[in-house]
UniProtKB/Swiss-Prot annotation:
Pfam families for the chain: KIF21A, KIF21A_2nd, Kinesin, WD40
Gene3D superfamilies: Kinesin motor domain (3.40.850.10), YVTN repeat-like/Quinoprotein amine dehydrogenase (2.130.10.10)
Residues in Kinesin motor domain copies: 8-370
Function according to Swiss-Prot or TrEMBL: Plus-end directed microtubule-dependent motor protein which displays processive activity. Is involved in regulation of microtubule dynamics, synapse function and neuronal morphology, including dendritic tree branching and spine formation. Plays a role in lerning and memory. Involved in delivery of gamma-aminobutyric acid (GABA(A)) receptor to cell surface.
Residues the record lists as Phosphoserine modifications: S579, S1149, S1167, S1215, S1241
Residue positions, PTM Phosphothreonine: T582, T1237
Domain of life: Eukaryota
GO annotations of cellular component type: cytoplasm; cytoplasmic vesicle; dendrite; growth cone; kinesin complex; microtubule
Organism: Homo sapiens (Human)
Designated name of the protein: Kinesin-like protein KIF21B
Parts of the chain that traverse the membrane: none
Lineage, opening ranks: Eukaryota, Metazoa, Chordata, Craniata, Vertebrata
Bias (Acidic residues) ranges: 578-627
Length: 1637
């Protein structure tokens, strides 16, 4: 673990495995990892190096142990830590961190946070156990946790249980502060105290489930916020003092333990799960999801700016923008602060995510340059005590070094090490080398002993085999004995060598000490054999102890006499250490190297004798009076050394005695064992002899039996003998062949070694060659990139020079004009000419100003000088005319001064111009480079889409081939054609993959060039500017911005103009095709071949409607209009059906088409403006003509606004007043013609002042009148009743597929549900009431009140005349035949209450009763006998004849939100349910329905969010979801037929069918109604039905009803004339047209 100081941020890269969807779509892997190196390659040769790199197959445990485990250990030492997970959405960040809890997650797949929690509490338990074992006070730990969520730049507390999820958008009270040390902390955050691992895991799970997630096109469950899970660890542990060097310094007596104190360490661990960076066009996010994505990207951008500022190697950036985002503010400690930080960058390996992967790797690469300042979080008292202890230990160590002579002070006062210390270091090094040598020799001796044992055992076995009485047991016993004998022999030799060494040491000590009297006789005692008596050894030890006591007493007397005992003590100790080291080295050498070092021992003994002689002489010379003091000191030192030697000798002798005692015990044990064996053998011998003696008295029969037994055993032994002899021969033969085998083995080994050497050399050569090729290729690529870069620079320079040339030409033109003006000034003129000229100066001045305005921006100063010269000339003329007598001199000087100023400022303007040109070139380079990258990205995306299309087509062909093989295997020609088509598609896919790879390589090269350009920072140029130059640069920037803005506006205007023309051309062609098709249909009855032609065209056009065309109608697809599609290949698919349609229709003979159309028909094929005029005037064609009257009755109308085409310019629309006047004028004409279409839908925002009812209900004082539903004669009560008022047509929606004819108003709050018959309409609202309407009279009949809360569902049973309304957990049953009263109340738990159970409820009920659940929807069986109520996650079945519950449908894990009922062919009910758990389930009920019934089928795959609505027509089921998508299912095959992911911009709330037509209606929360073709599930048109969300939709035989949150129900008519089998492209273009015949 790194200590205190600077610590770089570590970066790890994890590459997730490919998804199955990516594999199916043919995505290639664009990343690779260098084996054994933390390096990842992107594309071909773009390499990134990090601290850790984890490839596709890396497990979670490896990531944790490599990256995070050390950080947890650092937390116990007081270091902060942070783990950051960064990457694009869907890259596996949440999986890596472990915050996405799933029931199916195994232990191996646990993320970083659960593993860190287990590690943390395991470390706490281990430290407490270790302290208990050591007998010290255990540390105390306090763990707390916080869980924050940063959602849309608002900090939310995920542990706050009182927070309402609906208040997510409100501002939180959490504040971020900074303490005195620069640390970041938050206030207002819930901090939970944790006591166990399970408790912390539960808190993590609770917070993770409260986190904001949603589904996008890239990820089913995408994190929509940044999450920060923080663990605070507070540790109070015992801090022991370090062992001081000298006990005298510490002052502690012997046996006193060192004092202990407590220190407090704190640490915090941040686990940061960042939300993924995302592109809106990839995720398909709209509305709230788009806002979340923008907020996420803003936070990550701020984080990137902070990383760039901290990782700047040049240290130019002074300010770090931590406060730009709350995310960077919270992570201020982790980035550049006090924390050990690791960033885990999660990337996708697929080539479709190449740009996101590249940006993530660049992002992470910048983070490696950040340096954090890591310190231990310790309380101040503990820090001060630790610092003082460290200082004391340092000073004590230094003092001991001075005392020991290790450090010395030189003459100049400098510190250094003594020669003794250096000598000791050398000796220690030599000692280490000798130890290694001894160890190696010991291993060699052991190997030799083993070999000797083996050979001797083999020899003994051979001897026994020759004798014929050997077996395996005896051989094993012999081998064990031999091994034991060798071991004992080795130990004996070691003991003898040690004894010899001890004898030599004792003799040296006796020779060196004149005071030892009993040492010499001890040598013969030790010189005996190892079996000498223990009394002799005891006697030697006793004598040595007596000598030791005498020496100690002598030393005490000498110390009393010594005046400098401290100095002597120091010297004696030094000599003692040296002698100990010398003796130890000698003992080890003699013990381990007895064979090699005999001579060296003799020489050592001689040297030692000489040393002892010199020491004796030194002691004997003590009588010299002059050197008495010095000799006295030497004697004292020698005496001290001898005492130590004696002590050591005694210890060695005692150890040797103990070892001998141990050997004696071992020998005695073995002797006893052998004696026991001998005794057992003797007993067995006696027993056998006794048996033999007793055998003589046995009978003949027993003798024969024993004889037979012995003969049998003898035969067996003979067979064993033969086998042993054969084995012996084989053994002899093997011994003979052993030498030959050994020679062959050596030869083969030599050959193998040579081959290995050759292989190594060859591999080395191959590596060198590969490295050389790689270097050459890299060099060539670099040269190519350099050349390309140089070429681009040259092109930019040429462009800049051309621009500079044009500017110079303009300046030259301006100078020429100035020169000509000056020449005109110098030319003399007559008074008449001057008089005429006096009339013209204003024109001349104006012309000069005009010319100045037409030149470039840099020529303005010259233009001003020309105009000043002209004004000067005017003043001179006025002087000649006598107007101004004085200003002659003043008229010429200003011009001269200006020219002087200009000459003085030439150098300044030149320098500023050069700086501006350099900046301009830099800007042009950056713009061109970014444009190139954007174009390459677009090309790569286009290729990826094309590859996906080809893969889908290839899969379809493969399935077709498999089906053809299964049905008719003999069709070889068809199979061959399909195989060829599949091969062609595979070749095309390979070609596209090559193109994608080239794009990736080019992008990488451009990114490298971009980095080089970024290195030349413009700040250097700007910082070197003076104030005047800066003003000039700012002025140039402003002018350039204005010019660019003007160019952009002009381009946009041109684009809009071209788009308008293109739309007009498309609509003209589609109108003509439509007219031709309609004309052909009329003639088709008499011409069968024409019918076949039309059918073929329709089939081909239906087949041509691909998924790309569907995207034109889908708001969430790749584009919202065909003008946004930039690829040429995409445009090829758009019009592929129209030329074929036109060509086939034009090929039909004129006879089939009948008479030609007149001039009024041709007007329809004109532009959109002419069509609008024809429609608005109403006289564009003859209505009397029956042909046109019949054609107009089948008018085609499609939406003009929506997702099909972009909105047209507002400048082309007429004002509302003009349209209202034209509508009023055209109204009488339309009312007289029966052939025209009914009134179209109302405008988007109808005027509320026309509605008397809404004006009256807006007054709160009259709110009580709303509850009156009686038939009073009061006019006020009649007005307050709900009415259905007709709605006039509006031009804005005349081309829509639906036209609003009426509007029902009467509810005061949003309408949630409705049901209708041909005469009655029933509505339920949030105002706790239901209303019944008469569709014939257009009035409200009755109001059904008394509901506890919102009425969420209402159904009418035509068989019984009962109405069922749902509110909270109650179903009210109303009998409308008598007086519209509630006759029964049904509950969700299955209870039946007579009458109205909620009549006493006056206020709105918020909660349900105990045991009850919210009922979301009800449905009636087609026969009217069963009622199905969706309550909770089940559906309760009611039998209406008895009003009793009979069963329950179960199987969902979430609340059932919607259901629908139909009948099968066997007249059984088929119930389909949709739940919040994203699944659609089907239940088929039999005749007897009782108990709990499970689903018969689960429709797969599920939606990405909860199901909101269902609709069934025949065998087709449609389901609409909150994920904005609609799916089409086949009930017979029970499979998914088709799906449109983004059918609407918001939740799909309602589905219904247009009666009698194969058309589906869908409505969403955005208020949009869409019409779909049921057969091929293609859009026909759409209309903005309401400004508020549409909650329900139903139909009857005449009308379509939509209920909305704007408190209204609109009645719609379908506009006839749309043909669902027409090509979608034609239908989409017709949506822009008006009424077409």
């Amino acid at each position: 673990m790194a200590g205190q100081g600077d610590c770089c941020v570590k970066v790890a890269v994890r590459i997730r495995p490919q998804l199955s969807k990516e594999k199916i779509e043919g995505c290639h892997i664009c990343t690779s990892v260098t084996p054994g190196e933390p390096q990842v390659l992107l594309g071909k040769d773009k390499a990134f190096t990090y601290d850790f790199v984890f490839d596709l197959d890396t497990w979670q445990e490896q990531i944790y142990s490599t990256c995070v485990s050390k950080l947890i250990e650092g937390c116990f030492e007081g270091y902060n830590a942070t783990v950051l997970a960064y990457g694009q959405t869907g890259a596996g960040k949440t999986y890596t961190m472990g915050t996405g809890f799933d029931m199916a997650t195994s232990e191996e797949e646990q993320g970083i946070i659960p593993r860190a929690i287990a590690h943390l509490f395991g470390g706490i338990a281990e430290r407490k156990r270790r302290a208990q074992e050591q007998g010290v006070a255990g540390p105390e730990f306090k763990v707390s946790a916080q869980f924050l969520e940063l959602y849309n730049e608002e900090i939310l507390d995920l542990f706050d249980s009182t927070r309402d999820p609906d208040t997510r958008h409100r501002r939180s009270n959490i504040k971020i502060h900074e303490d005195a040390n620069g640390g970041i902390y938050t206030t207002g955050v819930t901090s939970r105290l944790i006591h166990s691992q399970e408790e912390l895991i539960q808190c993590l799970k609770q917070g993770a489930l409260s986190r904001t997630t949603a589904s996008t096109q890239m990820n089913v469950q995408s994190s929509r916020s940044h999450a920060i899970f923080t663990i605070h660890l507070c540790q109070m542990r015992m801090c022991t003092q370090p062992d001081l060097v000298n006990e005298a310094v510490t002052g502690l007596p012997d046996g006193t333990p060192p004092s202990s104190e407590y220190e407090t360490l704190t640490a915090k661990f941040h686990f940061v799960d960042l939300a993924g960076s995302e592109r809106l066009k990839r995720t398909g996010a709209t509305g709230e999801r788009a806002k979340e994505g923008i907020s996420i990207n803003c936070g990550l951008l701020a984080l990137g700016n902070v990383i760039s500022a901290l990782g700047d190697q040049s240290k130019k950036v002074v300010h770090v923008p931590y406060r730009d985002s709350k995310l960077t503010r919270l992570l201020q400690d982790s980035l550049g602060g006090n924390s050990q930080t690791i960033m885990i960058a999660c990337v996708s390996p697929s080539d479709r995510d190449f740009m996101e992967t590249l940006n993530t790797l660049k992002y992470a690469n910048r983070a490696r340059n950040i340096k954090n300042k890591v310190v231990v979080n310790q309380d101040k008292t503990s820090q001060q005590i630790s610092a003082l202890r460290a200082e004391i230990a340092r000073l004590q160590m230094e003092l001991m070094e001075y005392k020991a002579g290790k450090r010395v002070i030189g003459e100049d006062g400098a510190e250094g090490y003594s020669d003794l210390f250096r000598e000791n270091a050398m000796l220690q090094k030599e000692n280490g080398a000798l130890r290694l040598r001894v160890k190696a020799m010991q291993e060699a001796i052991d190997a030799i002993n083993n070999r000797v044992t083996q050979l001797m055992s083999q020899e003994a076995n051979l001897l026994l085999a020759k004798a014929g009485d050997g077996n395996e047991a005896i051989g094993a016993l012999i081998q064990n004995y031999i091994r034991e004998i060798e071991e004992l022999r080795t130990k004996l030799l070691e003991s003898e060598a040690m004894n010899e060494s001890l004898r030599r040491s004792l003799s040296r000590a006796s020779a060196r000490s004149p005071y030892s009297l009993g040492a010499s006789p001890a040598a013969p005692a030790f010189g005996g054999s190892p079996a000498s008596s223990m009394e002799d050894a005891s006697e030697v030890i006793r004598r040595a102890k007596q000598d030791l006591e005498r020496l100690k007493k002598k030393e005490v007397r000498q110390r009393r006499k010594s005046p400098e005992k401290e100095a002597f003590k120091k010297r004696a100790k030094l000599q003692q250490e040296n002698s100990e080291e010398t003796d130890e080295n000698e003992a080890e050498e003699e013990e381990e190297e007895r064979d090699e070092s005999g001579c060296e021992e003799e020489e050592g003994r001689e040297d030692e004798d000489e040393d002892s002689g010199s020491e004796e002489s030194l002691v004997d010379s003590d009588s010299d009076p002059e050197e008495k003091e010095v000799n006295f000191q030497a004697d004292l030192a020698d005496l001290t050394c001898e005492i130590e030697i004696k002590q050591k000798l005694i210890d060695e002798l005692e150890n040797s005695q103990r070892r001998l005692q141990t050997l004696k015990h071992q020998y005695e044990e073995k002797l006893i064992l052998l004696q026991n064996k001998i005794r057992d053998t003797q007993l067995e011998r006696d027993r056998v002899l006794q048996n033999l003696s007793t055998m003589e008295c046995y009978t003949e029969e027993k003798a024969n039996k024993i004889k037979a037994d012995y003969e049998k055993r003898l035969r067996e032994m003979n067979r064993d003998l033969q086998k042993l002899q054969a084995a012996q021969k084989e053994h002899a033969r093997l011994l003979k062949n052993q030498s030959r085998y050994e020679r062959e083995l050596k030869k083969l080994q030599a050959e193998v070694a040579e081959m290995k050497k050759a292989k190594v050399a060859l591999m080395k050569q191959m590596r060198e060659e590969q490295q050389r090729r790689r270097l050459v290729e890299t060099k060539r690529n670099r040269e190519i990139a350099q050349l390309k870069k140089e070429q681009r620079r040259q092109e930019f320079q040429i462009r800049a020079l051309e621009s500079q040339k044009r500017q110079q030409e303009m300046v030259l033109r301006r100078k020429t004009q100035e020169v000509s003006a000056l020449r005109r000034l110098a030319k003399p003129m007559s008074e008449r000419v001057a008089g005429r000229a006096g009339l013209k100066p204003p024109m001349l001045d104006s012309g000069a100003e005009v010319s100045a305005s037409t030149t470039s921006s840099e020529a303005e100063s010259g233009a001003r000088s020309v105009s000043s010269i002209v004004r000067q000339w005017n003043r001179k003329i006025n002087h000649f005319l006598g107007d101004h007598p004085a200003p002659t001199v003043n008229g010429t000087r200003p011009a001269r001064k200006k020219f002087q100023k200009k000459g003085a400022s030439q150098s300044f303007s030149k320098a500023a111009r050069l700086k501006w040109q350099s900046l301009e070139r830099r800007i042009i380079d950056i713009v061109m480079q970014r444009m190139t990258i954007v174009n390459l990205e677009a090309d790569m995306e286009r290729l990826i889409k094309k590859r996906e299309e080809l893969f889908l087509l290839q899969e379809a062909l493969r399935r077709k081939r498999e089906r053809l093989q299964a049905e008719s295997p003999e069709e070889e020609k068809g199979l061959q054609e399909l195989a060829e088509e599949i091969e062609v598609l595979a070749a095309n896919i390979d070609y596209i993959n090559d193109g994608i790879t080239d794009c990736q390589a080019t992008i990488v090269q451009l990114e490298e060039t971009k980095e080089e350009l970024d290195s030349t920072d413009t700040s250097v140029v700007i910082s070197s500017c003076s104030l005047a130059e800066a003003r000039l640069l700012l002025d140039n920037f402003l002018k350039a911005s204005i010019d660019k803005g003007l160019q952009v506006a002009q381009k946009e205007a041109q684009i809009r103009l071209l788009e308008g023309r293109l739309r007009q051309t498309d609509m003209a062609g589609s109108s003509q095709n439509h007219l031709l098709l309609d004309a052909l249909r009329e003639k088709a009855e008499a011409h069968p071949e024409l019918q076949a032609l039309i059918y073929n065209v329709q089939q081909e056009n239906g087949y041509a409607s691909t998924d790309e065309e569907i995207s034109e109608f889908s708001e969430g697809s790749f584009s919202q209009s065909f003008t946004m599609k930039g690829s040429t290949s995409h445009d090829d698919f758009k019009f592929k059906s129209e030329p074929k349609l036109s060509a086939q229709m034009k090929a039909v003979s004129a006879e089939c088409l009948g008479p030609p159309l007149d001039i009024s028909t041709k007007n329809i094929t004109k532009s959109l403006a002419s069509l609008v005029e024809i429609k608005e005037d109403g006289v564009g064609f003859s209505v009397r003509d029956p042909y046109y009257r019949d054609r107009v009755s089948r008018t085609v109308s499609l939406p003009t606004r929506g997702s099909t085409f972009p909105r047209q310019s507002r400048a082309t629309e007429t004002s509302p007043l003009t349209r209202r006047k034209s509508y009023d004028r055209g109204q009488p004409i339309r009312s007289t013609d029966v052939g025209f279409t009914p009134p179209s839908s109302p405008p988007t925002r109808p005027r509320n002042d026309r509605n008397v009812f809404s004006r009256l209900t807006s007054n709160q004082s009259q709110g009580s009148a709303l509850d009156k539903s009686d038939d009073s004669d009061s006019s006020l009560s009649e007005v307050l009743r709900g009415i259905i008022s007709p709605v006039g047509g509006a031009k804005g929606a005349r081309t829509a597929p639906l036209q609003c004819v009426s509007m029902a108003e009467g509810h005061t709050k949003p309408i949630l549900c409705l049901d209708a018959t041909d005469e009655l309409l029933f509505t339920g609202s949030k105002d706790r009431s239901c209303k019944m309407w008469n569709l014939v009279t257009g009035q409200e009949i009755a109001a059904l009140k008394g509901h506890p809360n919102n009425v969420v569902s209402i159904k009418y049973c035509s068989h019984s005349g009962l109405v069922f309304s749902v509110s909270t957990s109650y179903i009210k049953v109303w009998d409308i035949r008598d007086s519209a009263k509630c006759i029964r109340t049904l509950t969700s738990s299955g209870q039946v209450i007579s009458g109205d159970a909620c009549a006493a409820t006056s206020t709105r009920a918020i909660t349900s009763a105990q045991g009850e659940h919210q009922i979301n929807q009800i449905a009636l069986s087609p026969s009217g006998t069963m009622l199905y109520a969706a309550s909770g996650n089940a559906v309760r079945i009611w039998e209406l004849s008895r009003f009793q519950p009979v069963g329950k449908l179960t199987g969902h894990i979430g609340p059932v939100m919607c259901l629908t009922v139909t009948q099968t062919a066997s007249q059984h009910d088929l119930v389909v349910t949709g739940s919040k758990d994203h699944y659609v389930k089907m239940f088929e009920l039999g005749e007897c329905v009782t108990g709990t019934i499970g689903p018969t089928h689960n429709f797969e795959p599920p939606h990405y969010d909860g199901i909101e609505c269902l609709a069934i027509q025949g065998d087709i089921l449609f389901s609409g979801s909150r994920d904005n998508g609609i799916k089409k299912w086949d009930l017979d095959q029970q499979e998914l037929i088709q799906q449109i992911p983004n059918a609407h911009k918001d939740w799909v709330c309602a589905l219904a069918f247009i009666p009698g037509r194969p058309m589906l209606l869908s409505a969403c929360r955005a208020g949009v109604i869409k019409v779909w073709n049921v057969d091929n599930f293609t859009p026909i048109g759409e209309i903005k039905g309401h400004d508020s969300p549409i909650n329900a939709i139903c139909t009857n035989a005449k009308h379509i009803f939509t209920a909305s949150s704007d408190c209204r129900v609109k009645l719609w008519n379908y506009v006839p004339g749309l043909t669902p089998c027409l090509p979608r492209r034609v239908l989409a273009i017709k949506g822009r047209a008006t009424t077409l015949p």
